[in-house]
Amino acid sequence: MGTRRVTPGCAAGLLVLLLRCFGLAEPSEFSGDDSFTIVNENTGKCIQPLSDWIVAQDCSETRSMLWKWVSQHRLFHLESQKCLGLDMTKAADNLRMFRCDSSVLLWWKCEHHSLYSAAHYRLDLKDGYATASTNSSAVWKKGGSKENLCDQPYREIYTRDGNSYGRPCEFPFLVGETWHHDCIRDENHSGPWCATTLNYEYDQKWGICLKPESGCEGNWEKNEQIGSCYQFNNQEVLSWKEAYVSCQNQGADLLSIHSAAELAYITGKEDIARIVWIGLNQLYSARGWEWSDFKPLKFLNWDPGTPSAPMIGGSSCARMDTETGLWRSVSCEAQQPYVCKKPLNNTVELPDVWTYSDTHCDVGWLPQNGFCYLLANESGPWDAAHLKCKAFGGDLISIHSLADVEVVVTKLHSGDVKEEIWTGLRNVNSPTLFQWSDGTEVTLTYWNENEPSVPYNKTPNCVSYLGKLGQWKVQSCEKKLRYVCKKKGEITNDTRSDKLCPPDEGWKRHGETCYKIYENEVPFGTNCNLTITSRFEQEFLNDMMKKYDKSFQKYFWTGLRDADARGEYSWAATGGLKQAMTFSNWNFLQPASPGGCVAMSTGKTLGRWEVKSCRSFRALSICKKMSGPQEPEEATPKPDEPCPEGWHTFPSNLSCYKVFHIERTVRRRTWEEAERFCQALGAHLPSFSHMNEVKEFLHLLQDQFSVQRWLWIGLNKRSPDLQGSWQWSDRTPVSTVIMHREFQQDYDVRDCAAIKVLDNAWLRTWYYYDERKFGYLKPFSCDAKLDWVCQIPKGSTLQVPDWYNPERTGIHGPPVIIDGSEYWFVEEPRLNYEEAVLYCASNHSFLATITTFTKLKAIRGKMENLSGEEQKWWVKANANPIDHYFLRTRPLWHRFSMLLDEECLQMSAKMWHLDLNKRADCNDKLPFVCEKYNVSSLEKYSPDSAAKVQCTGKWIPFQNKCFLKVKSEPVTFSQASSTCHTYGGTLPSVLSKSEQDFIISLLPEMETSLWIGLRWTAYDRISKWTDGRNLTYSNFHPLLVGRRLSIAAYFIDEESHYHCALMLNLRKSPLTGTWNFTSCSERHSLSLCQKYSENEDGRPWETNSETVKYLNNLYKIISKPLTWHGALKECLNENMRLVSITDPYQQAFLSVQATLRNTSFWIGLSSQDDELNFGWSDGTYLHFSNWAVDNEKLDDCVILDTDGFWKTADCDENQPGAICYYPGNETSKEVRPLNSAKCPSPAQSTPWVPFQNSCYNFMITKNRHRTITQKEVHSLCQKLHSKAQILSIRNEEENNFVVEQLLYFNYIASWVMLGVTYENNSLMWFDKTALSYTHWRAGRPAVKNHKFLAGLSTDGFWDIQSFNVIDETLHFYQHSILACKIEMVDYKEERNSTLPEFIPYEDGVYNVIQKRVTWYQALSMCSQSGRHLASVHNPKEQLFLEDIVNRDGFPLWVGLSSHDGSESSFEWSDGSAFDYIPWKSQGSPGNCVILDPKGTWKHENCLSVKDGAICYKPTKFKELASHAHSSKCPLVKRNGSQWVQYGDHCYSAEQALHTFAEAKKLCQELDHSATVVTIADENENKFVSRLMRENYNITMRVWLGLSQHSLDQSWSWLDGLDVTFVKWENKSKNGDGKCSILIASNETWKKVECSRGYARVVCKVPLSPDYRGIAVLFAVLSVLALISGLIWFLVQRNHFRWTGLSSVRYEHGANEDEVMLPSFHD
């Protein structure tokens, strides 16, 4: 590990987490609001939207190619006025341009030069089109530069005036139909203005833009006497950091006050706010108070007692009471008005303080650049020291620059860093004004922590500095200290050259070192490798480089590089050794990447460090030569030095660590409180210089926790001086790049970092977290309250404040502390089990139980250290061993004892897994472990008071809570919880119905399910929220009652073993806001975080205002006694209406109004028919209700009560108030369809929903699970209404409507139950009507009894569940909603006709194959009964077939198909002409056709399985011509077709379809002389065509043996004959293929591709001699040969005895073509 040199210059340390903190931390020179082109580096092309695509084209600066960063990380395209987004619901083509208020993912962020969004998608370029890809390596840059797209990110523009309390602009914002990406001007506003929400028309939130202005016009007031301009933002309430950024963005700063006159001017303003922020802060680690504009803090007007003595809970920002002019430190997160300030004249000439001058001084005095210094050895009070210096011809030291500070800390001191030395700074005034005793102007202040602390109303006050640190402190002038005198010396060289430096021109001296600039731009390391060791050296180099400020920005190489590309930067190796960093000065967002080399910038970021390419980047050089001995490195701790008792370390580390967690401290703390806590112990929050330190540190922490923790570390960017860069609180320089995608986000004003301890301790057995470590470090809001870790150098002495309770080693050694348990290990005395139990009890503890793997690991380790791995120890059995609920999924070695009935347990470090699973002898004498449940506290009392939590920034207050809307991609519960922690909050807890209503009112535009803070195991009782509050209110979805959920748990994912709660956002469903639960490892939206506030603030809800706006409606709250009719009249007088409540969001918002006012209000609901039906007074249809459960509806008018429910009340009684409203577009009077039914009033708190001529009630009552049969459901429907039936669905529109209703419950239920029954061998509805419309998922159900359930799923398909499997049936029912339906039209007569088996029509009889078949199977089944698949030839026949299909209810095959390979040439399978087209356009692929119940003719693949087919049998048959069969034709093989003679050839027509290749092979198989048919003349063409028509099957296409040669493009027959006859069809229709077919229907030929399509095959063979005679002759000869052989054998056997043969005679049969062989005669 490298050394950590603590120098006064180490204050500028930065760690870059690559946090894109847009707008709140970057330097003010980054405008970030300019438009730019997006260039792909590989192609040089720019992207722009074109139609529905984003394309790459040649770059230009036209509006069509310009983009801008706008709010919420969106990329806005200027011309299209849309944002680049990702539609995650699509697997492909998901990158599109969307409206900027779309719900799709619109955010984009940068990583190096790539652009990424959710789910690891990155912007890519393929084939000229921009796409989103997860493996993209595309590099994107801003046009005309080498900048990353995020190098100048979007900056917030804050506002004033208006009605947004100073909130920043939201870009783009919508006014009318135009999206504006910048502030706009119009006659209605006094200056350029913007909306602070997306939709100005909707929200009407706006403010005047605060942008840079030249001079003091507009929003500024000028004071020439003081020389400054001021901006008083009296109505704008922001946090200190937001106010600072608002001023910075205008080229100004927060108010600084430097004189009593300026203070009087500010306090004299009559219209100024009472409390305002000023720029005073102490946010820079280990430094004191300073102005944010870096002017000297010499004038003070602290409130008495502020700042107090150093406190742990001190606040680091200051505000001013403008009535008294007094200043007080407060929490930086408070929301307050603010004042900005900028100078009238900004041309300040800075003195030259860094140029070296040879100086002559008296003996004993230190010469330095024209002055002489003397550090006195004697001590004395300030006045005596002042007189002594005067006597020496000088004065007490005055310090005017960092060059002077450098003299103090590097030249005058070499001893104790805490030595205090008098300076010449003193105050004798009230209010305080510090002045130098030598009369020079105060141009610099360098205060120590919590300084300047000036006693109230006591003067004089004198200032000392602290030895080696050089920082200043206010002291009593009577205190005796050493002092430094200063006087002018004699400059001995006017030329300002120095003999120690080389004689070459350009060398400059600083201390004992010489420097020179080389102005040629070269790669890294060409000239030299510059090292920078302190802030003073950096300031000197800045002085050398400042002449380049006005030229084009230049860079200067340093010697800093990451040679190993591991993200660890060090100075270039000298002598083979890397030199560790002792100082860092990174620029904003740096170091940006590993593996680079570091250069210093010029311009506005003069001297800041940036990572550049070592090879390709060119920069100037500064070389450095030492003219004296190199300063020795400061001593660092040794790895073997000890740690304080109770502190921990790891090998080779130089620090000790201690965790302070809630179980051992009074409370969790903010970052500043935690850092001050550590400082009080002589420590700091942790810092890291190397990657392995992070890894080891995490390992150390994980051994102490069994649950996830976030812990503060020392990383922060709080100070304005850091300009958005990061530093360690202990001044350790930042040398490490931590690169992870999670870090590359802007976290607004999250200026402090925390580290997460992984909770999956057992998982680490297999997974080492090294590759995942970066996910455990995140920026947080600094006011978040977390546990923390302190770090102290090894060998240091721990400071012990009186409130601290340090670890003490007891008689049994130090304890082991895990979470909230404290374990003591008792080696002696050794006792039996019962004695060990008693011993622990006598010491206020218990025999230890082990319930987590973290505890097991720690206890095993301690046992092994104390007594070796074999020794057994007593522990106690536990009824709930380690995570017992998933032990069944673990191997043996991860199990704990199952012998829970046996109390005595012992374990050893080595064999614990076996020890805990076997019986032990309780009389054994063993050591044992005791456990204290109340772990020893590390604090005797709280030394500080907790800072008050307020609802700041975008936090929305409600009662004692603050809520924050968050946008994120879907995350697990723990990820959601962690993100809320980074904001300083938790996931929401819902403690009352009023909180539930408030949260519902925030749900519009959020996702359909969002995490809330409930987490439990399946074996736990849900009792607490994750914020620790008790579960006193619940709102689980009623469908969860009585339902058994099956939630998968995975061994490898511990989070999946927990259940977590979701809040459902079901849009306009009355169940919006109810809760569901699921596995915690699932991914859902994080939309809300909460934190508790100590101030109940209802400002955004304007509870005292009569008029409130919500969503698109304007409401007026009338707070006076009124009758219902009086309320109606009162609203009309206001040109408004008595409110109608049409959705759950309005209901929740108005419920909150009633709750906050504790008042019931009249609403516009009343009944005109004695409480039978209720309706809204403005005619809005009643489809949403929120009746109280116990409301009996005894009166005709309705109130919204204080509990948020609707209740009836007497219309003539006075109620405390009423709510009027003026509806916006969304809630204006609904236009009900003419055919929409008028439905009854809501039943059982659920409304009847109208659609077409029916009303529907979707039952969600808690007792609905008690019904399961359809008869029981029908009975339940009858109770709701006498005409109600269980749900039936008549058409597609109704099906879609029911699906839309079901989607409101889609996270709870999967089906709506359908009233389908089975009677008379068919399915029908419960009301005995036919299923005229169906949408079964798996096609025609194969049910033959009534033992099933049917349901409509969320995707619109119908599912059927047989009773065969009980678990599946129960699951189906428990995930179904019951629905009742009232049909206002009697469908029974219309829907009652069933489909007969045979249907005669004109010249045919039709029937339906009611079976799932392919097209070819349907064709075969029709053919087997002498039928054909149906064909259509006119509209009348089409309507007839459509009626059959509609009555059957399923899509059916017809006889239409295409086999040409292009799905274009369709033919009827019965051979009839395709003379009528039954569809308007071909909308689907496929080569066969079905007809569906909607009358749609669809193309489908012939091999796909459908629900049946239509066959027909003609009543009139055609007579077929006969063909002669000749014996001169080949014999028929197997089941082949008969050969037919025509002329001197034979022809065989195959029934099957074949490709051309198959056709050639087939003919060869039939006869070796056969070929695919060739045609010589017109007559043969007619014969073949007629043959195919008479033997028709599927198609008229016939392969011809005619093909085209590739070489000469000539055509030839396969049998080698010349082509003497052709009959090509019309050239315009003919193809360009190299094969040919005959179309038998019109007897023409067509060119086709040889490899595409199918056709029939006709084989042709020449007519030969009598084939049958030849066969007989061959057979006879064969027999004779056999006989001859037999005779020869017999002759040989019988010694050549001879027997004669009779003659053989051939005879002709009756048929001359036949050859007969009747018999053999002896």
Swiss-Prot record:
Residues 32-182 form the Ricin B-type lectin domain. The modification Phosphoserine is found at S1703, S1719. The modification Phosphotyrosine is found at Y933. Residues 1-27 form the signal peptide. Disulfide bonds join C169-C194, C183-C209, C247-C340, C317-C332, C389-C485, C462-C477, C597-C614, C678-C790, C752-C782, C1060-C1080, C1197-C1211, C1488-C1502, C1635-C1650. Residues 1692-1722 are cytoplasmic. The chain crosses the membrane at residues 1667-1691. The keyword Disulfide bond applies. One of its GO terms (cellular component) is membrane. It is found in: Membrane. Residues 28-1666 are extracellular. Coiled coil: none annotated. GO terms for molecular function: carbohydrate binding. Expressed in the thymus and cultured bone marrow cells. Residues 225-341, 368-486, 493-625, 652-791, 958-1091, 1110-1222, 1251-1374, 1401-1513, 1542-1661 form the C-type lectin domain. Keywords: Disulfide bond, Endocytosis, Glycoprotein, Lectin, Membrane, Phosphoprotein, Receptor, Repeat, Signal, Transmembrane, Transmembrane helix. GO terms for biological process: endocytosis. It is a single-pass type I membrane protein. Glycans are attached at N135, N345, N377, N529, N843, N865, N934, N1076, N1225, N1320, N1392, N1593, N1626. The keyword Signal applies. Pfam families: CysR_MRC2_N, fn2, Lectin_C. Its main location: membrane. InterPro entries: C-type_lectin-like, C-type_lectin-like/link_sf, C-type_lectin/snaclec_domain, C-type_lectin_CS, CTDL_fold, FN_type2_dom, FN_type2_sf, Kringle-like. Acts as an endocytic receptor to direct captured antigens from the extracellular space to a specialized antigen-processing compartment. Causes reduced proliferation of B lymphocytes. This is Lymphocyte antigen 75. The lineage of its organism: Eukaryota, Metazoa, Chordata, Craniata, Vertebrata.
